[in-house]
Curated annotation (Swiss-Prot):
Native source species: Macrococcus caseolyticus (strain JCSC5402)
Family: Belongs to the MecA family.
Disulfide bond positions: none
Pfam (any one): MecA
Family annotation (HAMAP family): MecA (MF_01124)
Gene3D superfamilies: 3.30.70.1950
NCBIfam families xref list: PRK02315.1-5
Record InterPro entries: MecA_C_sf, Neg-reg_MecA
Its job: Enables the recognition and targeting of unfolded and aggregated proteins to the ClpC protease or to other proteins involved in proteolysis.
Gene Ontology molecular functions: protein-macromolecule adaptor activity
Domain of life from the UniProt record: Bacteria
Domain notes: The N-terminal domain probably binds unfolded/aggregated proteins; the C-terminal domain interacts with ClpC.
Descriptive protein name: Adapter protein MecA
Subunit annotation: Homodimer.
Length: 220
């Protein structure tokens, strides 16, 4: 999850569908289940609050935008009634206001739901999982990867090893995928561990373009 502090009262964060699934939710849950959508939103807001000290002690205005790879959420805190809430909502508490907004915004746009459902049904994504012996191998791979492509990936820590999950969508050619994997195996080893096992027992260290993040934190 990427978080951007727009100003004192507004935050923007982006989650890939891999990020959403890593938190125990399915992408369709957000659009077809009000309860799941609310659970997901509040769990993410707790993470955001811990990282950015973004306390939500009043009315919130939430905008949710869906893209091919994930969702972007913009959260704005109402300050001095800058955000004009309907007068008949005055007796609602913050949870009810936010939940009503989420429900209305997610269920009023049928075209958006149809797009997400089709994307889920038509997806032909391939994935590959490897493990690195130590962090140094992760760093070397990140710096010597010949292609800096924008992909969905996750770096897990599980039983003292670093596991790298990479997802290729149908826009990448078979040759490009094979080349990427071949280069990856110069620094890592194949594994029989499943993505479900990593999700359940592993800890996500980095998500969404792991290589760029590694290069950001470990300068050479």
């Amino acid at each position: 999850m990427r978080i951007e502090r727009v100003n004192e009262s507004t935050l923007k964060f982006y989650l890939t569908y891999t990020d959403i699934e890593a938190r125990g939710f399915k992408r369709d849950d957000l659009w077809t289940s009000r309860k799941k959508g609310e659970e997901f939103f509040w769990s993410v807001m707790e993470e955001v609050n811990q990282e950015e000290d973004f306390f939500f002690d009043g009315p919130l205005w939430i905008q949710v935008h869906a893209f091919d790879k994930g969702i972007e959420v913009v959260v704005t805190k109402s300050k001095n009634d800058d955000l004009q809430l309907p007068e008949d909502d005055s007796d609602l508490n913050i949870d009810e206001k936010v939940n009503d907004f989420i429900n209305n915004s997610m269920h009023s746009d049928s075209e958006l739901r149809d797009l997400l459902m089709r994307a889920s049904e038509e997806s032909t994504e391939q994935f590959f999982i490897v493990h690195f012996d130590d962090l140094e191998d992760v760093i070397q791979f990140s710096y010597h990867n010949y292609e800096d492509v924008d992909i969905e990936d996750l770096l897990y820590m599980y039983e003292g090893k670093y596991y790298y999950y990479v997802e290729f969508d149908d826009h990448m050619s078979e040759d490009a995928i094979h080349s990427y994997i071949a280069h990856l195996l110069e620094y890592a080893n194949e594994t029989q561990i499943s993505h479900e096992q990593l999700d359940e027992y592993g800890k996500i260290v980095m998500s969404h373009n792991v290589k760029r993040q590694v290069k950001q934190y470990f300068k050479q």
